[in-house]
Curated annotation (Swiss-Prot):
GO terms for cellular component: cytosolic large ribosomal subunit. The gene is rpmD. This is Large ribosomal subunit protein uL30. It holds the Pfam family Ribosomal_L30. Belongs to the universal ribosomal protein uL30 family. One of its GO terms (biological process) is translation.
Length: 59
């Protein structure tokens, strides 16, 4: 399976609680933090919900 590197590029300050929890569920804590995750439909759904806050690269 492919892997995705996800970076939180914008702050969650002032964002709805659902978006904050989604960012936390992806394993991101601070701005500019990154994680590498497996590419699957569940992760894609989470990314789609907060894509305006993230930068995604395929690894």
């Amino acid at each position: 399976m492919a892997k995705l590197q996800i970076t939180l590029t914008r702050s969650v300050i002032g964002r709805p609680e659902t978006q904050r929890k989604t960012v936390e569920a992806l394993g991101l804590k601070k701005t500019n933090s990154s994680v590498v995750v497996e590419d699957n439909p569940a992760i894609r759904g989470q990314i789609n919900k907060v894509k305006h806050l993230l930068t995604i690269e395929e690894k």
